Amino acid sequence: MTDADIRLNILIFAQRGLLFAVPPSLRAMTCGWSGTTVNVRFVFDGPISEDDKESARIVGTEVVAGFPSPWTLTEEIVRLDYPGDLRSDALPLWVYARKETTTEGLPIY
């Protein structure tokens, strides 16, 4: 699998996983990979409820389900209240970013 294939799979499966799963408090989701490990990072605004954590874990599972064995998943679910800089500790692939006045100029690609 080429890097382009991996990137495309991550983006497609993350988008599918996010359908009907984005709470208002989710500020961003970024992804990346290292070897055969997919890394996902969810950034929330305010307290993170157990329901929010479960939704994030389901999205992560949807992402890694698009890859054959031996691919694995690492998840990071963090609180970074607005207007904290979303670029700090972001992974390279931006899958979702909530509209905020501070999101202008983010590397969305």
Which positions does each model-derived feature cover?
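N-terminal presequence-like segments and adjacent domain-start helices
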Residues: M1-L11
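Short, non-transmembrane amphipathic alpha-helical segments
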Residues: Q15-L18, I48-T72
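Short edge beta-strands and adjacent turn/loop segments
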Residues: A21-N39
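Residues at or immediately flanking beta-strands
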Residues: N39, T72-T74
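Short beta-strand-to-loop capping motifs
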Residues: F42-G46
